[in-house]
């Protein structure tokens, strides 16, 4: 699949990660290898461990990192299992973990239901081997559970209306494509909501994607494991794309600072420049936070 994915805050994240002069880094969201490539270019003695749940992205990354053969290992895994990956690699301590959260262009451009711009099967799985899909969430979850997900993970103010409409529609026939789900959403949200800054389906799609992939649980679990695997001055670098992720990261690094485990490097999150947002509108909501192991 020839899709060019533009890594967000690339220069800033790689600089923060590698400026400690370390030798072993973990890219917990390898994707197509955009960040990994820049990390490996930094110094010839760097070894990189890449983790991703997405088989297609891994194949693209292998191709993109060919010139660094022998200087990286790639694992198909959920980043919450980073401790198991390190054990398998025979490494206990590393100099940095990078997390670039959210959906990659490879997933948005594939026929996997991550986008509402095209009519695709309702899937949304980052790991195609897992059984829970967006279709199952939309057609099988009880109304109260749909409301909870839309409120909690989508921060959707019309969660009740949308959930009720989904339940009504699926009684007639299952909702099987992204287009059908968008139609349901558009049928119940007020007119003004259709002309806002973001598409009225954005929050619903985000909420369902987070539920399908258990994104927030995985993030919390992964972050909690990182302090046990840092060398001194190891860096934690995290790029988030919505307030739910950012809150989790902010809370985690503040807690670890209180416990005397981390020093916070970015007092305020780093955000993309106007130029980057112009070139890559998908970067507009990105926030970068960095902490260092004491």
UniProtKB/Swiss-Prot annotation:
Signal peptide residues on this chain, from the entry's feature table: none
EC number per UniProt: 2.1.1.199
A GO molecular-function annotation: rRNA (cytosine-N4-)-methyltransferase activity
Alphabetical UniProt keywords: Cytoplasm, Methyltransferase, rRNA processing, S-adenosyl-L-methionine, Transferase
Subcellular location: Cytoplasm
Superkingdom of this protein's organism: Bacteria
Gene Ontology CC annotation, any one: cytoplasm
Primary localisation category: cytoplasm
Region Disordered: start-end pairs: 273-294
Binding site for S-adenosyl-L-methionine: 33-35, 52, 79, 100, 107
Reactions this protein catalyses: cytidine(1402) in 16S rRNA + S-adenosyl-L-methionine = N(4)-methylcytidine(1402) in 16S rRNA + S-adenosyl-L-homocysteine + H(+)
InterPro entries registered for this protein in UniProt: RsmH, SAM-dep_MeTrfase_MraW_recog, SAM-dependent_MTases_sf
Annotated disulfide bonds: none
Family: Belongs to the methyltransferase superfamily. RsmH family.
General function of this protein: Specifically methylates the N4 position of cytidine in position 1402 (C1402) of 16S rRNA.
NCBIfam families noted in UniProt: 16S rRNA (cytosine(1402)-N(4))-methyltransferase RsmH
Protein name per its UniProtKB record: Ribosomal RNA small subunit methyltransferase H
Gene: rsmH
